Amino acid sequence: MEKLSNGVRDHCLISDYVSPSAPAPLKQPFVIGVAGGTASGKTTVCNMIMSQLHDQRVVLVNQDSFYHSLTKEKLNKVHEYNFDHPDAFNTEVLLSCMEKLRSGQPVNIPSYDFKIHQSIESSSPVNPGDVIILEGILVLNDPRVRDLMNMKIFVDTDADVRLSRRIQRDTVERGRNIQNVLEQYTKFVKPSFDEYIQPSMKYADIIIPRGGDNDVAIDLIVQHIRTKLCQHNLCKIYSNIFIISSTFQIKGMHTLIRDINTTKHDFVFYADRLIRLVVEHGLGHLPFTEKQITTPTGSVYTGVDFCKRLCGVSVIRSGESMENALRACCNGIKIGKILIHRENNDGRQLIYEKLPKDISSRHVFLLDPVLASGYSAVKAITLLLSKGVPESHIIFLNLIAAPQGIHALCKKFPMLKIVTSEIDSSLNEDSRVIPGLGEFADRYFGTNNINSKVSSLSTNLKLRS
């Protein structure tokens, strides 16, 4: 969607299907970086993605908008200026604008006039979108810019095709003659491509050959984006988080177990149902091999045979509530136990552990229904690693998780898989999950009534004395 008027490239364009005055999205946007050599078809790829995401608010940011304005001395020698070098861009302003868009703030992005080689301030703010596409030859070169992206794309097009497109674009749209274009290409464009642009291809998640002519690649990219847009923000950051598909039935069960007025009997019943779903989902992440069997009709059925070397490890007390569901799904499974004592807000002490002797050769389901700060989980996972369990063989199962706990685990153990049914908002000052469901173990095992009776008895004794 590249538009040029009097040599000025529009700094940021919003999908024609949505009004620019639409309110900013509440969820963190999905950021896509599209890089490639000059005239490789980056803009065409961006246009195709935007047209297929017509039901989403899409913002396109061009790296060309962030060129430095040239001084009089540089203007006099403009043909000696390398526009394809990283130093030609004002990356600090680019980073500032992208951070504001990602945080849901409107921002003024400059435009760049290629005829006078000056940056022009924008008078109208650009609102953020559900999807932000950052396009430019060097958007994958700077690690600070790469870190802002959820998906990185490199458009790979033949050098001869890129040169012919560049000649046509610069002569028709930017008022240059063919000789100057060829001189600039030989002196700056080609060397910069070899030194900076092509090496950045290694950072791309997806490489698109033939650019906009590759309809299959564009369709697959759009499908992936749509999937990510439906996910929680943390799932866009960490690929090892898996949330079971939310339905009205699952939402209804969450409503019941979170309700303070729910009886113990109902709490246990619906918690067990949710735990069973989480366990079943976790089993789907185990390795498998193809297996052929014969059915009672004499037909051959090609299916799969799941990993047999599996065990569970429950974090006492609340983790024990998940053992029955695991046993119901995996008959005869070995289950170990870990007891971790909380010393203070961020301290944990291992009190007890009893694990299968051959645990290092097994895949492990770590069981704890609530992931809060993540300190206990880190302690438990560290113990499993010390026993020789590969990090990639650990699947952490829980019902609800707080963002703080997810960050703590995923940053420390990137090969670990986390399977949960919902991600909650945050933690309060007492490190309890909000909105949460209270003390899970007390509600599940019925010990909250015992605690209240002990507290009441203690109060009565004090009053009598």
Swiss-Prot record:
<feature type="binding site">
    <location>
        <position position="342"/>
    </location>
    <ligand>
        <name>5-phospho-alpha-D-ribose 1-diphosphate</name>
    </ligand>
</feature>
<dbReference type="GO" id="GO:0005525">
    <property type="term" value="F:GTP binding"/>
</dbReference>
<feature type="binding site">
    <location>
        <position position="368"/>
    </location>
    <ligand>
        <name>5-phospho-alpha-D-ribose 1-diphosphate</name>
    </ligand>
</feature>
<feature type="binding site">
    <location>
        <position position="264"/>
    </location>
    <ligand>
        <name>GTP</name>
    </ligand>
</feature>
<feature type="binding site">
    <location>
        <position position="273"/>
    </location>
    <ligand>
        <name>GTP</name>
    </ligand>
</feature>
<keyword id="KW-0418">Kinase</keyword>
<dbReference type="GO" id="GO:0044211">
    <property type="term" value="P:CTP salvage"/>
</dbReference>
<comment type="function">
    <text>Involved in the pyrimidine salvage pathway.</text>
</comment>
<comment type="pathway">
    <text>Pyrimidine metabolism; UMP biosynthesis via salvage pathway; UMP from uracil: step 1/1.</text>
</comment>
<comment type="similarity">
    <text>In the C-terminal section; belongs to the UPRTase family.</text>
</comment>
<dbReference type="GO" id="GO:0044206">
    <property type="term" value="P:UMP salvage"/>
</dbReference>
<dbReference type="InterPro" id="IPR027417">
    <property type="entry name" value="P-loop_NTPase"/>
</dbReference>
<protein>
    <recommendedName>
        <fullName>Uridine kinase-like protein 5</fullName>
        <ecNumber>2.7.1.48</ecNumber>
        <ecNumber>2.4.2.9</ecNumber>
    </recommendedName>
</protein>
<dbReference type="InterPro" id="IPR006083">
    <property type="entry name" value="PRK/URK"/>
</dbReference>
<feature type="binding site">
    <location>
        <position position="362"/>
    </location>
    <ligand>
        <name>GTP</name>
    </ligand>
</feature>
<dbReference type="GO" id="GO:0004845">
    <property type="term" value="F:uracil phosphoribosyltransferase activity"/>
</dbReference>
<keyword id="KW-0808">Transferase</keyword>
<feature type="binding site">
    <location>
        <position position="439"/>
    </location>
    <ligand>
        <name>5-phospho-alpha-D-ribose 1-diphosphate</name>
    </ligand>
</feature>
<dbReference type="InterPro" id="IPR029057">
    <property type="entry name" value="PRTase-like"/>
</dbReference>
<feature type="binding site">
    <location>
        <begin position="438"/>
        <end position="440"/>
    </location>
    <ligand>
        <name>uracil</name>
    </ligand>
</feature>
<keyword id="KW-0021">Allosteric enzyme</keyword>
<dbReference type="Pfam" id="PF14681">
    <property type="entry name" value="UPRTase"/>
</dbReference>
<comment type="pathway">
    <text>Pyrimidine metabolism; CTP biosynthesis via salvage pathway; CTP from cytidine: step 1/3.</text>
</comment>
<keyword id="KW-0511">Multifunctional enzyme</keyword>
<dbReference type="Pfam" id="PF00485">
    <property type="entry name" value="PRK"/>
</dbReference>
<dbReference type="GO" id="GO:0043771">
    <property type="term" value="F:cytidine kinase activity"/>
</dbReference>
<dbReference type="InterPro" id="IPR000764">
    <property type="entry name" value="Uridine_kinase-like"/>
</dbReference>
<feature type="region of interest" description="Uracil phosphoribosyltransferase">
    <location>
        <begin position="240"/>
        <end position="465"/>
    </location>
</feature>
<keyword id="KW-0547">Nucleotide-binding</keyword>
<keyword id="KW-0342">GTP-binding</keyword>
<dbReference type="GO" id="GO:0004849">
    <property type="term" value="F:uridine kinase activity"/>
</dbReference>
<comment type="similarity">
    <text>In the N-terminal section; belongs to the uridine kinase family.</text>
</comment>
<dbReference type="InterPro" id="IPR000836">
    <property type="entry name" value="PRibTrfase_dom"/>
</dbReference>
<feature type="region of interest" description="Uridine kinase">
    <location>
        <begin position="26"/>
        <end position="230"/>
    </location>
</feature>
<feature type="binding site">
    <location>
        <begin position="307"/>
        <end position="310"/>
    </location>
    <ligand>
        <name>GTP</name>
    </ligand>
</feature>
<dbReference type="GO" id="GO:0005524">
    <property type="term" value="F:ATP binding"/>
</dbReference>
<keyword id="KW-0328">Glycosyltransferase</keyword>
<feature type="binding site">
    <location>
        <position position="317"/>
    </location>
    <ligand>
        <name>5-phospho-alpha-D-ribose 1-diphosphate</name>
    </ligand>
</feature>
<feature type="binding site">
    <location>
        <begin position="373"/>
        <end position="376"/>
    </location>
    <ligand>
        <name>5-phospho-alpha-D-ribose 1-diphosphate</name>
    </ligand>
</feature>
